[in-house]
Amino acid sequence: MSNVSMKAMLEAGVHFGHQTSRWNPKMGQYIFGERNGVHILDLQKTAKELKKATAFIKEEAKKGARFLFVGTKKQAQEAIKSEAERCGAYVISEKWLGGTLTNFQTVKKSVERLNELEKWEREGVFKAISKKEASRLGKEMVRLQTLLGGIREMKSLPDVVFVIDPVDTQGAVKEAVILNIPVVAVCDTNADPDNIDYPIPGNDDAARSIKLFCAAVADSIIEGRTEAEGPKQPAQETPAAEVENTIMAQALEGALTEEVAVPAEKTVEETVKPEGAVVIEEGEEIEEEEKLHGREEKKAKKEAVKKKPVVKKAPKAKKVESAD
């Protein structure tokens, strides 16, 4: 829930009301006094009512409620549009069309008409017709964009209506009351708080005061939706010691498996060999036998050569030359 300090409200001029001649006696419970012909609001009561209103808004936001911001006076337009956009609320900041809530089906048809005109413009239809007709359709499109731009995505009635100055936008308040839609409103000293579910006594003419209230409501909506989504759980990291123990256990298990396990293809007799024994495969055994026969044959030949008697040749006779 958004908390607004007394200092912030004083700096924004929240405590300034209307002239004493323009007050509504029903707002008397929220008035602190009078100064220079102007009523001064009790900021302690303002803080209390603002806290109640934002608590309600936050709870509704948790439930997935849809909000409509309404503020059509010039000094409220910028603040109410920007804050509604920030918190994802619908907004009407130009003019309240009678029947926006009570005749919502007609409003939906107007939105469909707006979508159709924008489609024609994209497809170049305006260029294919007369300039007079194109101008007429263009003006109609701009008018609908201005009036319905902030609610064109609103497929059903809102769950809560937030109003700046219920006197200026009394049409919105009346329609919300008829449809039993809760109303939260910033009420100056000239307002009637009876039809407001959550009245917030405050200055509804100063731009800074309006900005403060709009921001507080938007913050409450964002907080409620964030809490409804729940905090994001960070990925849990496995402790280093646990990882090390797991690796050691796997390594030990693998070593034991290699030492004890008997391959399915071999018999126990083939697997269990004396220490230091050399295991020879079938092909290697034949090759080794051939090599052994070859060595034995060579050895026999050598022995035969040794046993064979050696015959010495007689020396050649020397040739004697005859003497003539």
UniProtKB/Swiss-Prot annotation:
Family designation: Belongs to the universal ribosomal protein uS2 family.
Biological process annotations from GO: translation
Classification via InterPro entries: Ribosomal_uS2, Ribosomal_uS2_bac/mit/plastid, Ribosomal_uS2_CS, Ribosomal_uS2_flav_dom_sf
Biased composition, class Basic and acidic residues, residue ranges: 290-303
Organism of this sequence: Elusimicrobium minutum (strain Pei191)
The keyword ATP-binding is annotated on this UniProt entry: no
Cellular component, GO annotation: cytosolic small ribosomal subunit
Gene3D superfamilies: Glucose-6-phosphate isomerase like protein, domain 1, Helix hairpin bin
Compositional bias per record (Basic residues), positions renumbered to this chain: 304-317
GO molecular function: structural constituent of ribosome
Keyword presence, Transmembrane: no
Assigned keywords, A-Z: Ribonucleoprotein, Ribosomal protein
Official protein name in the record: Small ribosomal subunit protein uS2
PANTHER family: 30S RIBOSOMAL PROTEIN S2 PROKARYOTIC AND ORGANELLAR, SMALL RIBOSOMAL SUBUNIT PROTEIN US2M
PROSITE patterns, alphabetized: RIBOSOMAL_S2_1
Residue segments, region Disordered: 273-324
